[in-house]
């Protein structure tokens, strides 16, 4: 790779690192091409970048970005997973991926400016994702309206039952 290509890679990585809300640094050892391709597809479908990075280029690209505090962890085989909107989904996908593979190890992560370790990433993976949270919030907002509708309807239903019972009583009497 010549100098121009390296500068281009650094520029591209710097741009992505600057936009990233979450960046997970992992060590992808002993994975075959089919497994990595499957992981890349799952991450790409979730709009998450997965890059095997050259450590020196990644460290240079990280300067002046939110990823800079974890640049010292770019040692040995390094995969960089970056998400630009949802911070939970990459952790969930990687935790799921790691269940069957001992060779894939998370070193560290930076989530919205806060550095967390591998255990923190595992804990983050157990949290509800953005879509789940939105669904829960929508349900919580809709719940009071549903209860109110039931409360408003209940007295009318009770009155209708009383009137119906009185009508039946009068019909039986004659």
UniProtKB/Swiss-Prot annotation:
Q: Which InterPro entries match?
A: Ribosomal_uL10, Ribosomal_uL10-like_sf, Ribosomal_uL10_bac, Ribosomal_uL10_bac_type
Q: Which Pfam families match?
A: Ribosomal_L10 (PF00466)
- Please give the function described in this protein's UniProt entry: Forms part of the ribosomal stalk, playing a central role in the interaction of the ribosome with GTP-bound translation factors.
An example of a GO molecular function for this protein is:
large ribosomal subunit rRNA binding
* A Gene Ontology BP annotation from the UniProt entry: translation
Assembly:
Part of the ribosomal stalk of the 50S ribosomal subunit. The N-terminus interacts with L11 and the large rRNA to form the base of the stalk. The C-terminus forms an elongated spine to which L12 dimers bind in a sequential fashion forming a multimeric L10(L12)X complex.
Q: Extract one GO cellular component term from the record.
A: ribonucleoprotein complex
Q: Which residues form the signal peptide?
A: none
- Whichever gene encodes this chain, its name is rplJ
* Protein name listed in UniProt: Large ribosomal subunit protein uL10
Q: Which UniProt keywords apply?
A: Ribonucleoprotein, Ribosomal protein, RNA-binding, rRNA-binding
The family classification in the record reads: Belongs to the universal ribosomal protein uL10 family.
């Amino acid at each position: 790779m010549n100098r121009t290509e390296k500068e281009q890679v650094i520029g591209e990585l710097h741009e992505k690192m600057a936009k990233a809300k979450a960046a997970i640094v992992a060590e992808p050892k002993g994975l075959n091409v089919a497994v990595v391709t499957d992981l890349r597809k799952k991450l790409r479908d979730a709009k998450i970048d997965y890059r095997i990075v050259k450590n020196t280029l990644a460290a240079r690209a990280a300067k002046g970005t939110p990823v800079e505090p974890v640049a010292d962890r770019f040692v040995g085989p390094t995969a960089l997973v970056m998400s630009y909107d949802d911070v939970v989904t990459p952790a969930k996908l990687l935790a799921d991926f790691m269940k069957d593979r001992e060779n894939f190890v998370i070193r560290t992560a930076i989530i919205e400016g806060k550095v967390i370790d591998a255990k923190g990433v595992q804990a983050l993976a157990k949290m509800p994702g953005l879509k789940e949270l939105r669904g829960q919030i929508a349900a919580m907002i809709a719940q009071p309206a549903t209860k109110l509708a039931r409360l408003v309807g209940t007295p009318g239903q009770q009155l209708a039952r009383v009137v119906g019972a009185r009508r039946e009583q009068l019909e039986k009497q004659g």
